[in-house]
């Protein structure tokens, strides 16, 4: 195994305290959304701070056009795979559409994420309108974050994927949502598709750390989907996504080479086949011949 692929020998899972304290220390926390065992393993090897089991997996892993079809059963199954792939990485489970629309439902599903999925914390979406849900989760002892700005669960109300907070009034609503999340006891919040200056100013008003996706460099940390930044998911690329690799191109080239070698008889060769002792093979041929004449 190369040095680049070797697991960090002394890596310890991040704690809630460390994540909260990153606000004061100035350490930029790195989050990435990982839908499966392999991408989670890559994230841990790379030193990512938080592996996010995002309901975006409904799109990048299941081919849906939005996150709405994600179910708790689906999310728990993927969370289990992520935990196996990244056992030493703090894991945050994103609660899917309508899985937290009542306090009882939120507590039940958040508990599933923690007990069955192996997550270290959960993240619903929403601010003031969900503050009672967030507080109930926190009060029950479940580490909880939230997500504001562009919230995929309410995308239809926004008229599609549109930047949020571009007017002073809209920006104030995001600020009030942020304070509601903090007051509910959440340890972190995520901004999505918010103008950089707005997200930066709001972040400075808060005591809890913020992470951004399409919210500029002024947030306390950043999150991108691993399938986006690695070029695995290529159906579309949001403006805020930077491609650090193009694994789809590499994968297609590899598969084309495989197809070509099988079609032309070059694969498998002796190096990729199992041998047999000559005497055993000769005996086998004799047995086959005898069977033909029975």
Swiss-Prot record:
GO biological process, one term: pantothenate biosynthetic process
Signal peptide annotation: none
Cofactor binding comment, as recorded: Binds 1 Mg(2+) ion per subunit.
Catalytic residues as annotated in Swiss-Prot or TrEMBL: 192 (proton acceptor)
Pathway(s) annotated for this protein in UniProt: Cofactor biosynthesis; (R)-pantothenate biosynthesis; (R)-pantoate from 3-methyl-2-oxobutanoate: step 1/2
Gene Ontology MF term list: 3-methyl-2-oxobutanoate hydroxymethyltransferase activity; magnesium ion binding
Enzyme Commission code(s) on record: 2.1.2.11
InterPro entries reported in the protein's UniProt record: Pantoate_hydroxy_MeTrfase, Pyrv/PenolPyrv_kinase-like_dom, Pyrv_kinase-like_dom_sf
Superkingdom in the source lineage: Bacteria
Entries under SUPFAM superfamilies matching the protein: Phosphoenolpyruvate/pyruvate domain
Ligand binding (Mg(2+)): 55
Protein's UniProt keywords contain DNA damage: no
Catalysis performed (reactions): 3-methyl-2-oxobutanoate + (6R)-5,10-methylene-5,6,7,8-tetrahydrofolate + H2O = 2-dehydropantoate + (6S)-5,6,7,8-tetrahydrofolate
Names of the cofactor(s): Mg(2+)
Function: Catalyzes the reversible reaction in which hydroxymethyl group from 5,10-methylenetetrahydrofolate is transferred onto alpha-ketoisovalerate to form ketopantoate.
Protein name: 3-methyl-2-oxobutanoate hydroxymethyltransferase 1
Organism: Methylibium petroleiphilum (strain ATCC BAA-1232 / LMG 22953 / PM1)
